[in-house]
Amino acid sequence: MSFAQILRGSRAMASPKCLPESNYSTSHLRFPRLQSITSKKNSRARGDWGLKRTLPKIKTRYICVRQQDSLYKQADFQSSAKFVRLVRNWFDAGFVRDPSEVALLQELLKETGLKDTRDINKVFSPSKQSDENDNFRRYGVSGGIQYSNVPLINSRVTPNCESNCSNIRRRLTAHIISSDASTAYYGLGGLILRLPRTVVFNRNRSSPLFSQEQRISYTVYKNGRLRLVPFSGPELETHLAYPSEDSEVESFFNRDIQLVAKRDSSLDAPVSYQRGIMKFFMAPSQTSNNEANSSEKDNLSNS
């Protein structure tokens, strides 16, 4: 009997717990907060990771276990190699970074065996460093990965963007959080994006198709606003994107979507999508002033 089989049959075996929270806010911002499990090549080919249950066969030798197995719910896992690919994609998109983050990416590339054909040092230079939007660092915009703030949106205005036009327009992937009969919720950098389900008609029956990933095209304006549209289909002018509160940023993607559903039901009237984004990326004082100005305009128009 192998050591992995002994561990799997033992009641004392448990998945590694999450790393303890630190008293310093910047002590672990650039490093994963979840422990990883590694396995030999011949073991992982069989899906044998030394846990109580056999996991699906995957090529990478890094997985992250988010919580312990219980009688009612088994621990979900994901590949740590996703983090490396996500960082590379966001670097290609032209996001702000510093030398320590570039060094972190190089170490991850060595560990995972991925080859980087580009010179990462050419991407970052102090002379070309653009101003960062404090709200992006504050809310941890990380493309759906909550344990790192490596990707930061570059809000620099280029000479070609003189008016309120976009200076960044890229495509990215938002991962599913929850869904119901008619709506799908995706997590994207501390935001919850609500999209309607798509229905595809075939010869036999019409069934709603729901994908675990959604291709999103986003546009960053020079005033700091962020606009999200589907890769194909109508623009999201009538759909809301809800930001996470300060206390929910760390565990936002591990929480139930019902918290956001309650917040949605508490709204008295539908709010436009752009207004929700403005309230997220603007300071609270500016938001209150804008709401006061809008209410004054409404009163004048009614009078």
UniProtKB/Swiss-Prot annotation:
Residues of the transit peptide: 2-13
Expression induction: More highly expressed in the fermentable carbon source glucose compared to the non-fermentable carbon sources galactose or glycerol.
GO cellular component: mitochondrial small ribosomal subunit; mitochondrion
A Pfam family per the record: Mit_ribos_Mrp51
Coiled-coil regions listed in the entry: none
Impact when changing residue 21 to K: Creates an N-terminal cleavage site that is partially processed
Disruption phenotype: Inviable.
GO term, biological process aspect, one: mitochondrial translational initiation
Location in the cell: Mitochondrion
Residues the record lists as N-acetylserine modifications: 2
Any one GO molecular function term: structural constituent of ribosome
Keywords: Acetylation, Mitochondrion, Ribonucleoprotein, Ribosomal protein, Transit peptide
Quaternary structure, from the entry: Component of the mitochondrial small ribosomal subunit (mt-SSU). Mature yeast 74S mitochondrial ribosomes consist of a small (37S) and a large (54S) subunit. The 37S small subunit contains a 15S ribosomal RNA (15S mt-rRNA) and at least 32 different proteins. The 54S large subunit contains a 21S rRNA (21S mt-rRNA) and at least 45 different proteins. This subunit is mutually exclusive with mug178/small ribosomal subunit protein L51-b.
Function (record text): Component of the mitochondrial ribosome (mitoribosome), a dedicated translation machinery responsible for the synthesis of mitochondrial genome-encoded proteins, including at least some of the essential transmembrane subunits of the mitochondrial respiratory chain. The mitoribosomes are attached to the mitochondrial inner membrane and translation products are cotranslationally integrated into the membrane. bS1m functionally interacts with the 5'-UTR of mitochondrial mRNAs. Plays an essential role in mitochondrial translation.
Similarity comment text for this entry: Belongs to the bacterial ribosomal protein bS1 family.
Name of the protein in question: Small ribosomal subunit protein bS1m
Organism in which the protein naturally occurs: Schizosaccharomyces pombe (strain 972 / ATCC 24843)
